[in-house]
Amino acid sequence: MNKLNFHNNRVMQDRRSVCIFLPNDESLNIIINVKILCHQLLVQVCDLLRLKDCHLFGLSVIQNNEHVYMELSQKLYKYCPKEWKKEASKVRQYEVTWGIDQFGPPMIIHFRVQYYVENGRLISDRAARYYYYWHLRKQVLHSQCVLREEAYFLLAAFALQADLGNFKRNKHYGKYFEPEAYFPSWVVSKRGKDYILKHIPNMHKDQFALTASEAHLKYIKEAVRLDDVAVHYYRLYKDKREIEASLTLGLTMRGIQIFQNLDEEKQLLYDFPWTNVGKLVFVGKKFEILPDGLPSARKLIYYTGCPMRSRHLLQLLSNSHRLYMNLQPVLRHIRKLEENEEKKQYRESYISDNLDLDMDQLEKRSRASGSSAGSMKHKRLSRHSTASHSSSHTSGIEADTKPRDTGPEDSYSSSAIHRKLKTCSSMTSHGSSHTSGVESGGKDRLEEDLQDDEIEMLVDDPRDLEQMNEESLEVSPDMCIYITEDMLMSRKLNGHSGLIVKEIGSSTSSSSETVVKLRGQSTDSLPQTICRKPKTSTDRHSLSLDDIRLYQKDFLRIAGLCQDTAQSYTFGCGHELDEEGLYCNSCLAQQCINIQDAFPVKRTSKYFSLDLTHDEVPEFVV
């Protein structure tokens, strides 16, 4: 198509060019319609990258050195520069290196991680896990955890194993990698390139036989433990008059952090896990944090500088909190699987290695002594060691003498039975007396040895064996959990409610406020929360909402007396409490039915409130 036909074609004039930057330093150039939705663009990017699970990723644009994530329901041109929306005929011709020059300069968009998870097994798609790994790689390069310097060397070893495979002497020598691509700049400056190139090959060699997928999992698990890697940072102002932001808001996987900006460093002021955040309120540019358990006078008030930034932070905080709460049962299950696998590996290596060591030592001692008693003792020890070897493996000597088809259950039960061993501790502890002066010991020494041989010791706790036999849990590197869109935007999942949008009318004025509330935990976690809270207190105003629940009957009585006043009360349920006086399940189910979609919120007011209280508890507002 020539330029004249291109400018006369209205359809082509509505086309624009976008450049998508990927976490692995690659880019995609796409021609799209100027009125496309952000969700449609994200789908196109995932199709080009062959991503099946993209719920942890998002599209962002950089505004004032901050990544602003797009609302998928909005149109793309709301986030683009003004020049990008102009007609193609009015835009100067751009360089061909950016794509088709007729569509003008491309809009720069970043495809990056929006929601962090602490375990790579939560990412079902390997391609998504690959880009998640690369995103953390870039974050690690900017990390400043000076007290965790050893972690960067371990991360570099995992990354080299994932990128280059097993260490090979004839291939991986000298400067076979760039230290700047695997270490933060301050580590390279402190240690020097020669130091890194000298010691990292040995650590790379220790990761032998790890596949790329396993190395990605280990890298993700270790990288998120650094305090400043899996974090989103946003500027905050102490008051409206500030020109330069003096505070920084850090959104982590587990909560919110507030930092004081000091020259080139950040000093941590507050660290609020999600369980300690009572409510977040955005009123225009004002941002309020109400910590759980503190009186209302102790709330923290900051400013975002723009109502749009307030809305963006509210959505990001609410979705991150919802995902964190919904993933807790899954994470507990994964930790249990991994712990059982580690115990099993440790148990097998412990039995096998110690018995092999005992056999080698006793064999040398028996040869050195040359006595008949020593040889007799060696035969007896070899019999015990053989029995113990059959216990440490599922297919022991008895399995060889009686060949038959065994399933996984049979092999597991047989290994559990063979774990009942006769101990060899007495013989190893008295090994010197057996090899040097056994004949002079007489009958007393032989009787003691016979008594020691009759002692039986259980290598494993029977309760552990019963529990493992019932669960029979196995972990594989390819095991993964699917994160669905329901975990971010669902109405109810795993007992955790979504956003509740209500219109609350004030008794003193005719105006209404849009209150967005998020319920944090299900009834399953309620007893754990109550165990952490004191049941008695001398000052009721200093109690959290969980403590106020203990005085619900008093509040119901107060509400009846003060119903005609200007104060407003909102209670979690109006039914009577159960025998324990803790919760009303029928009211929770009724409220979960009335849950609305998370966003967009009606723009009838500039007041947004995010309530992160853990339970359906009465709210006492004075």
Swiss-Prot record:
Protein name: FERM domain-containing protein 6
SUPFAM superfamilies tied to this protein: PH domain-like (SSF50729), Second domain of FERM (SSF47031), Ubiquitin-like (SSF54236)
InterPro entries given in the database record: Band_41_domain, FERM/acyl-CoA-bd_prot_sf, FERM_2, FERM_central, FERM_domain, FERM_N, FERM_PH-like_C, FRMD6-FERM_C
Disulfide links within the chain: none
The FERM domain, residue ranges: 16-328
A family per Pfam: FERM_M
Biased composition (Low complexity): 384-395, 425-438
UniProt keyword terms in alphabetical order: Cell membrane, Cytoplasm, Membrane, Phosphoprotein
Keyword rRNA-binding in record: no
